[in-house]
Amino acid sequence: MANQKCDELIELIGLQRFYIESITNVMAETGKKWYDGEIGIAEEHMITNIMRKVVEINNHKIEVKGLIEGVVVICNPGGDDHTMSNLVLEGLLKIRKYKVVNIGGNWYMDENTKATNTAIINFTIETRPDIVFISVTIARYLFNAKLIAKELSKALSNTKVFLGGLGTQGVFEGELQNGILLANKDTLNTLNNL
């Protein structure tokens, strides 16, 4: 039933608008309700899991036909395992004919921060992407994301390396090392200027 309603809405407004307007608003409202104590963490996780499934199903339906625009790696720093924004970004990039390699997810820091960073960096370098998006949802992982971005911008001089997400609020372009770009808070603006 829920998938049918989503499909009807996507048919009406298009997948991009569905992701930007509907999914983003549901997740923002859910986060606000959790933060304000109106719902518990279990309810927040349930809603997130439902929305994640909806996005994953629709991402798998996107067919990239013809020449691709380039290869994009999406990742997040160790410890920041909020993958919802990565999945939405993946779909928006696939709509624009990019081949997307999404390695965001459950990277746990513990004592292995350096090993985690190295794994992310090495995989990304081996992939040789045209663009890298490092998504930071929680600000405490921003330092780690900047370390990854710094290494990638040195190793992949012809690759655009973007740092973005809720965890980058308050960061200014001038604070970032040369070769690292701050993704616009308006996701579509960033994507339209690739």
What name fits each language-model region?
Residues 88-102:
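Short helix-loop-beta junction
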Residues 66-72:
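A short, charged/proline- and glycine-enriched loop
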Residues 53-55, 83, 92:
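ATP-dependent carboxylate/acyl-activation modules
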Residues 161-194:
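Peripheral docking tails and interdomain loops at the edges
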Residues 100-101, 108-172:
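Cofactor-cradling patches in redox/metallo enzymes
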